Structures are given as C-alpha cells and as structure tokens.
From Swiss-Prot:
Name of the featured protein: Small ribosomal subunit protein uS13
Annotated region (Disordered), positions in chain: 103-123
Subunit text: Part of the 30S ribosomal subunit. Forms a loose heterodimer with protein S19. Forms two bridges to the 50S subunit in the 70S ribosome.
Keywords from the named record: Ribonucleoprotein, Ribosomal protein, RNA-binding, rRNA-binding, tRNA-binding
Lineage: Bacteria, Bacillati, Bacillota, Clostridia, Thermoanaerobacterales
GO molecular function annotation: rRNA binding; structural constituent of ribosome; tRNA binding
Sequence similarity: Belongs to the universal ribosomal protein uS13 family.
Keyword Electron transport: no
Gene name, Swiss-Prot/TrEMBL: rpsM
Species name: Desulforudis audaxviator (strain MP104C)
Cellular component GO terms, alphabetical: cytosol; small ribosomal subunit
BP GO terms, sorted: translation
Function recorded in the entry: Located at the top of the head of the 30S subunit, it contacts several helices of the 16S rRNA. In the 70S ribosome it contacts the 23S rRNA (bridge B1a) and protein L5 of the 50S subunit (bridge B1b), connecting the 2 subunits; these bridges are implicated in subunit movement. Contacts the tRNAs in the A and P-sites.
Length: 123
C-alpha cells in the first residue's frame, strides 16, 4: 500500500482516482501530477514501482499544500474572516450559507436538522 502525505492510497484503484484520497488533490490536479512525473493514469496503485511512488511523494511535498497544512490554512482563513467582522465571517459564525444561497426554506446542511417552533394561541 502506497503512503503519500500521511494517507494510505487504496491498492485496487487507478492512481488517478487514488490520489484524490489526499485532502487538497482533486481529479484535475491528480492528472497534472501524473503528467509531470510521467506515470500512466490507468495504472493501479499496486502496480506502481517504488521509484514512481517516491517521485510522486517528492512532487507533492514540494509543490502542493495538502492535508494538515491546507486544513490549517483554511481554518485560519475562516478565523480571520470572523475576527475582522466581515459579512462572510458573520455567516460562518452563525452557521449559515456563506455564498448567498436562500435560507428561508433550504440550507439544511449548514443549519442542521429542523427545530420545530411551537405556535402560541390566544386563550
């Protein structure tokens, strides 16, 4: 099993797909990576040589911000937005959608499960 940036890549998947298990590497950056190190994207992870794995590992370490470093940067960016009191920071703080989606009916992913509000009737 190939281990790159602290992530065990699944042996039975194609390299192009397996690289996306690393936080910060998607399909397009995986394709670029494989092109740079001259590895066929159709190759299975179990068929990679040690040399190919080390070339991939070196390139990712040198040129890509992945896993812990990227997660830290994202959380610091969100913290900064909250501290400066921007609109985006306010939305993050309240747990609402940040990019302008409607919230009257949808936005359940950000808001969490429905909280039923009781109705008060006159006596």
């Amino acid at each position: 099993m190939a281990r790159i940036s602290g992530v065990d890549l699944p042996r039975d998947k194609r390299v192009e797909v397996a690289l996306t298990y690393i936080y910060g590497i998607g399909r397009s950056s995986a394709k670029q990576l494989l092109e740079q190190v001259n590895v066929n994207p159709e190759t299975r992870v179990r068929d990679l040589t040690e040399e190919e794995i080390s070339r991939l590992r070196d390139l990712i370490d040198k040129e890509y911000k992945v896993e812990g470093d990227l997660r830290r940067e994202v959380s610091l960016n969100i913290k900064r937005l909250i501290e400066i009191g921007s609109y985006r920071g306010l939305r993050h703080r309240r747990g609402l959608p940040v990019w302008g989606q409607r919230t009257r009916t949808n936005a359940r992913t950000r808001k969490g499960p429905k909280k039923t509000v009781g109705v008060r009737r006159k006596k």
